[in-house]
């Protein structure tokens, strides 16, 4: 990019933000009684030089991301034709034509190859107001059009909802191979899958550190379950703490503590320790089985599974182990609780009398339960929340093979994000991208 071009883009960004963009900004309020998806057109992106194919892929992924969010009614690009004479400056945009096809929002972009990777210049317009409201220059390393698209979609969501987007986040999961267990990550929509670890011993229960720098897993490398941490910066895989028969570790929201389970003889209790593995102490001392801790977003409470009532049920207690109370009273086999980052819901898996597994959510305060899946295969399990608490991902066999599905918090919109059969298990949604 030339110096003149960079200065022009900076001036344009100042011109459209923040004052102009703040005027009568159309805000999407999810969950409001009058919510409706916002109609938006994502025009064909312009590829500069040899970036034509990358521009096409970027636009396609942006459209798919916005559809997956459930916040937008993304108009079919076959319903409108590109106008070669239409530029990017607001005076050149034929807003009346875009209004005629039903668009309230319009996204356009230039994509080019920069010195270190792809660059995208995103432009967003409010069609009814006839103005440009956002311009953003985004860069990604290498030729990763998908990552560029996810960042663009995040910017669009941020403008309309005033909340961070979650498309640039990653999902961790365990994949079983022939005699191997792999720790893998992928984009939240199933793309860009990468293998981080391949072990000949069992791997289970991945859990992200809140800053995204490490993933905690349960490893059987020593022949017994132990907590190990994978570090992205140097790909180190190291044991954490001194407990054998420790499993299911999860970081506290501030990353300073880890709650986990220890099985000693016939006793299975919850423990907590500092993030470096020091200072471990018991949280529960009960003859029952206590497993699967999950933190409230403020770090003050922990939900977990216990069979102290005779069957596995969800309980909530203080983060110091005090005041445990039963939360679920429906069903006789409830497991894998996951506390929403918004704090209002806990997702979990329940098994019914037919041995069918489904996903539910429960209010941690009132105990009110809502069903997310029903009659959608025999297995819907292991829910994990997106960092915005509006979406979750879980494992399902509804189409004849194991898949990962993204759902909203009500279960109204459920979208497979893996194609065909997959052996992925224990999906864990990672934190917001830096």
Swiss-Prot record:
Keywords assigned by UniProt, alphabetized: Cell cycle, Cell division, Periplasm, Signal
Primary location class: periplasm
Signal peptide positions (record): 1-21
InterPro entries on file: 6-blade_b-propeller_TolB-like, PD40, Tol-Pal_TolB, TolB_N
Region (Disordered): 411-434
Intracellular or extracellular location(s): Periplasm
Cellular component terms per the entry's GO annotation: periplasmic space
GO BP term (any one): cell division
Lipid biosynthesis as UniProt keyword: no
HAMAP family cross-referenced by the UniProt entry: TolB
Family: Belongs to the TolB family.
NCBIfam families cross-referenced by the UniProt entry: propeller_TolB
Quaternary organization: The Tol-Pal system is composed of five core proteins: the inner membrane proteins TolA, TolQ and TolR, the periplasmic protein TolB and the outer membrane protein Pal. They form a network linking the inner and outer membranes and the peptidoglycan layer.
UniProt cross-references to PANTHER family, sorted A to Z: PROTEIN TOLB, PROTEIN TOLB HOMOLOG
Reported function: Part of the Tol-Pal system, which plays a role in outer membrane invagination during cell division and is important for maintaining outer membrane integrity.
Name assigned to this protein: Tol-Pal system protein TolB
Protein's organism: Anaeromyxobacter dehalogenans (strain 2CP-1 / ATCC BAA-258)
């Amino acid at each position: 990019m030339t110096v003149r071009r960079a200065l022009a883009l900076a001036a344009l960004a100042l011109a459209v933000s923040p004052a102009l963009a703040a005027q009568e900004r159309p805000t999407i309020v999810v969950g409001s009684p009058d919510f409706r998806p916002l109609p938006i057109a994502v025009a064909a992106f312009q590829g500069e030089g040899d970036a034509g194919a990358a521009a096409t892929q970027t636009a396609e992924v942006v459209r798919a991301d916005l559809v997956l969010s459930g916040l937008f009614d993304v108009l079919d690009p076959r319903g409108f034709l590109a106008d070669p004479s239409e530029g990017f400056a607001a005076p050149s945009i034929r807003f009346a034509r875009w209004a005629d096809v039903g668009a309230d929002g319009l996204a356009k972009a230039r994509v080019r190859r920069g010195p270190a990777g792809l660059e995208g210049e995103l432009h967003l317009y409010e069609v009814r107001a006839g103005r440009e409201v956002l311009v953003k220059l985004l860069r990604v390393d290498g030729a990763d059009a998908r990552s560029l698209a996810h960042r663009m979609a995040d910017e669009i969501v941020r403008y309309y909802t005033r909340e961070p987007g979650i498309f640039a986040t990653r999902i961790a999961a365990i994949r079983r191979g022939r005699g191997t267990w792999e720790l893998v990550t992928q984009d939240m929509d199933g793309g860009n899958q990468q293998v981080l670890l391949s072990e000949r011993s069992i791997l289970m229960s991945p859990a992200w550190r809140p800053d995204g720098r490490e993933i905690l897993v349960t490893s059987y490398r020593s022949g017994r379950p132990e907590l190990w941490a994978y570090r992205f910066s140097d790909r180190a895989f190291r044991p954490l703490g001194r407990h054998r028969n420790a499993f299911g570790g999860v970081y506290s929201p501030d990353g300073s503590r880890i709650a986990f389970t220890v099985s000693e003889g016939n006793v299975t209790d919850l423990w907590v320790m500092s993030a470096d593995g020091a200072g471990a102490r018991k949280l529960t001392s009960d003859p029952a089985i206590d497993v699967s801790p999950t933190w409230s977003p403020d770090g003050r409470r922990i939900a977990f599974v216990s069979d102290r009532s005779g069957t596995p049920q969800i309980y909530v207690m203080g983060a110091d182990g005090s005041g445990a109370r039963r939360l679920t009273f429906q069903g006789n086999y409830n497991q894998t609780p996951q506390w929403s980052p918004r704090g209002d819901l806990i997702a979990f898996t329940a098994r019914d009398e037919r041995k069918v597994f489904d996903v539910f959510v429960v209010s941690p305060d009132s105990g009110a339960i809502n069903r997310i899946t029903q009659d959608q295969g025999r297995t819907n399990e292991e829910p994990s929340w997106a960092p915005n608490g509006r979406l979750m991902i879980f494992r399902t066999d509804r189409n004849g093979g194991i898949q990962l599905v993204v759902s909203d918090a009500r279960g109204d919109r459920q979208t497979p994000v893996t194609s065909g059969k997959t052996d992925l298990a224990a999906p864990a949604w990672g934190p917001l991208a830096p």
